[in-house]
Amino acid sequence: MTKNSSTVFTHARIATLEEKAANLGLIEEAALVVKDARIVYAGPENKLPGEYASFEKIDCGNRLITPGLIDCHTHLVHAGNRAHEFELRLQGATYEEVARAGGGIVSSVRNLRAASEDDLVRETLPRLDALIAEGVTTVEVKSGYGLDRDSEIKSLKAARRLGEERDVAIRTTFLGAHALPPEMNGDKAAYIDRVINDMLPAIAEQGLADAVDGFCEGIAFLPDEIARVFDAAKAHDIPVKLHADQLSNLHGAALAASYGALSADHLEYTDGDGAAAMASAGTVAVLLPGAYYFIRETQKPPVEAFRAAGTKMALATDNNPGTSPLTSLLLTMNMGATLFRMTVEECIAGVTREAARALGILDQTGTLEIGKDADLAIWDIERPAELVYRIGFNPLWKRVFKGQI
């Protein structure tokens, strides 16, 4: 591991992922220069300024440099697993049937409440390590398995500690409106009161949330209930995002757009109006093919409608114990292509530039541009398409986080 803050990566091919660049912004025979954890040059090697001649050099051997990958939707902090529910679904039970029978999210709540913060960190690190091993440099982590003030705070603190234990950027999201805890006896209005009057103020005061999320679905919370949470988030000046239209069309995409949400996620049942509303609001569509695959969904998100509307699309693992126990963004890209018919360029942009946009950090990372964080992944491949094409193969050569290998 090098601690040199000034490095030139030579003999490289660079996919900058710049916004308007064609073909992933690919530059052949390129060099990239890092100084003080920032990118200071990314371009043709034969135009490399002489001022960098004394910097440490790393010969990339014509390998491909991309931005470090970004997993923009995870529930990485959880306790235990739900393999038994996997077996139930194989026997024919639906996601909704499992949830209504007391399984699903509520079973994860029991496990998380019983775990200590240290337990959560210890159990989560192997999942995080699996992502890091594939070139991931930023991970979004949601709460939502505590569903009371102390447990939600515990989850968010555990998530923040992940960034202290590993060289990775962590973005935390408060997902109090994830499910109704059993002690509320079906009283959703009273629970939303707790979310906005008890949990959110404490979390905001401690600065533990970079965003606020909700689950807008018949088995979770209806649009008017989510709107109350979003109004409270806006009062605390915290951006919002939404689990929307996964199992039915409750017009969650349009709701998210009406609040200027960073993203709306899942979106299998979103219609053309929802796609257009998201495009107008700049709300990113975060597609989660792992969950689609794992629960054997048949309704695909409207990728063509998103393209037609100009809605930006990101991809994420949705790592969670019940519906997407997935810790591979490389496999997620392949699923985005094979299941949702996304292009190679859409898939790679979806785990770099558009994932950064979905987290509100595109000004810091997600592309290889001067002034941005030196978060890089260097791949031993001949074509960018290999990142999407291969299954069960990791061609990562080096991962660079804030300029450090």
UniProtKB/Swiss-Prot annotation:
Zn(2+) binds at H73, H75, H243, D318. GO terms for cellular component: cytoplasm. It catalyses: 4-imidazolone-5-propanoate + H2O = N-formimidoyl-L-glutamate. It is an enzyme of class 3 (hydrolase). Its cofactor is Zn(2+); Fe(3+). Fe(3+) binds at H73, H75, H243, D318. This is Imidazolonepropionase. It comes from Brucella suis biovar 1 (strain 1330).
